[in-house]
Amino acid sequence: MKKYILMPVLAALSLSGSVIQAQDFDNNPVVNVSNSKENLNFTIGARFMMDGAYYHSDFTPVKSGAAITDARIRTSMSYEDWYFYADFDFSKGKFSQKNIFLQYSLEGAKGTHRFKAGYYNNPVSMANNTSRGSLHFISRSAAANAFSPSRELGLSYIFYNDHFFANQGVFAENKYNDQPSGYQGMSLGGRWVWRPINNDDRTFHLGAAFRYANIATGTVENNVLKTELDMGSSLETYVDATQDFLSAKLPWAKNVYDVGAEFLYKTDDFFARGEYMYKHVTKKRDDQALFEANLGSIDSWGSLESWQKGNPLGDNSFHWAYIEAGYKIFGDPYQYSNSDALLKGLNGRALEVVARYSYTGLNDLVEGEKYVPGRDQYYPNGVLADYPATSLSIGGGNMHSATLGVNYSFNKFAQVMLSYTYNRLDRDKFQYDKNFHVLQARLMFQF
């Protein structure tokens, strides 16, 4: 473990130059070592988050307590128009990589062009592309957590100027190609932003996003590859990050389409932003092979058509959205990044109050179907039957969440956050759990 920490430090010491401090400490680690003769710059930084949380629920307990929720070492190196960045996480007592990418920038007559390759966030979703260190909330919304793609191995092209931003790329389904069965699927994702107002005093942007993913990895059952899409979120908290209350599994998922819209408005002392996303999932399976595999068993059917009627397969659609706002009582003005089309975090001594509402829709229920808690499944036409009993309903849960928070930054390196979140859950599986109260605090420092 020690060698992973010492290697970037030794690399930094090997470079000659002076140590300076960067202004955007979240995106650029602050310890800089420069070699002007070679036009080379190396940075190293770290980030640590410690959370404490108290939970109150109607029936099923949630584990209150404290936890290390983020602990990272971050490094970067720039040479002329080339930039390399990597950060590594140790928060769960083990080493894991986060962002690792190489980027080439080219200044053009109409703006900046960037070419990016490595392991990083799919561009879809403004919230998911905002670093946790720049968030004005302890957690992203449950909506963004449940539906947004995470980091993926890919290639991207980015263009931006004062009024436009475009980020699109192609990505692999599995960064290690270590899936149990199947081959690498792929996805295409993009986010496009127009900034009709963008100056030192205020910024207003409107954006759109699209993603297509082809799922090609899974497990083999009866000599047939079974793909699956898993979605879920915690109760907008990290201390007990269980997704038991809000989650869904979509067997035989094949094609995933995400279409979204966003807005952002900020002045020196106020910001508001929000997103809406629609997700549609189509499914595919080898019915003939599964029908033949069941012949002669208790699950056998007389014909393929009767098997298909007893085992229907349908598409699913979901929706999610959030809106959040903040007011700065004192401190440096809110800042906006043209290169990322994102709101930056607090910088220097500051105090702010924030609020958010989010909706996460993981229910896609067929009218008339009945849920039986003892069997944890839905039954077609409201009829409880042992055979057949295949349902098209997805009961992952719908949740409304409202958050109020106060954030105080001592300086550009240390910050405390306090928030209260009320979650209202509607899920048949947890019929006695409707109300979840979350009171949590965070101590964060980074350099």
Regions found by a protein language model. Give the residues of each.
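N-terminal periplasmic/intermembrane-space "pro-region" immediately following the signal or transit peptide
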Residues: 6-15, 19-47, 335-336, 374, ...
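Hydrophobic alpha-helical membrane context
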Residues: 14-15, 82, 287
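Outer-membrane beta-barrel pore domains
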Residues: 59-60, 230-447
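Extended ligand-binding clefts on enzyme/binding-domain cores
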Residues: 202-243, 248-252
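Positively charged n-region of N-terminal signal peptides that target proteins for export
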Residues: 1-4
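Outer membrane beta-barrel
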Residues: 29-56, 60-216, 317, 322, ...
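Outer-membrane beta-barrel and related beta-rich outer-membrane complex signature
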Residues: 127-131, 180, 216-225, 284-288, ...
